[in-house]
Amino acid sequence: MTTDTIFPPHGRLMTKLTALGPYLRKQQSKEGEFFFDCLASCISANKSPEEREFWGWWLVLTATDIGFEYRYDFGRYDAKGNWIKGTLPAKHTEAVLKTLDDFYVKLTKFVKEDCQLDLQASAELEEAVLGSA
């Protein structure tokens, strides 16, 4: 017996994923793929707000046949609004990891419990699998 995976409609997913926190970038998301990021740690608070850069993470959630898969990276969010992949400085690592871990708990609960769908790391993931620690 086969069962089809039933996904909530795209608009409902956007609303629910937005409610998880201030992370969903609607303009960079599309049907079946959702882009999240977090500006976790300011590099220089002495600069004017529009010139500030941050250390943080971004995560892409992609629909699969049975749920979703994710991949994420760490880096610097520059003053132009671009992510630049890179190694986090030691003094910023804890703050950045905490925000990612906190978000992943909320994301997992939503996908697995509320939607009754699967959530797995992408085969393309270069970082550690989330929730495995």
From Swiss-Prot:
GO terms for biological process: positive regulation of DNA-templated transcription. Pfam families: Crl. It comes from the Bacteria. It is found in: Cytoplasm. The keyword Cytoplasm applies. Disulfide bonds: none annotated. InterPro entries: Tscrpt_reg_Crl, Tscrpt_reg_Crl_sf. Gene3D superfamilies: Sigma factor-binding protein Crl monomer. Residues 99-122 are annotated as: Essential for activity. Signal peptide: none annotated. Keywords: Activator, Cytoplasm, Transcription, Transcription regulation. Coiled coil: none annotated. GO terms for cellular component: cytoplasm. Belongs to the Crl family. Binds to the sigma-S subunit of RNA polymerase, activating expression of sigma-S-regulated genes. Stimulates RNA polymerase holoenzyme formation and may bind to several other sigma factors, such as sigma-70 and sigma-32. This is Sigma factor-binding protein Crl. It comes from Photobacterium profundum (strain SS9). The lineage of its organism: Bacteria, Pseudomonadati, Pseudomonadota, Gammaproteobacteria, Vibrionales. The gene is crl.
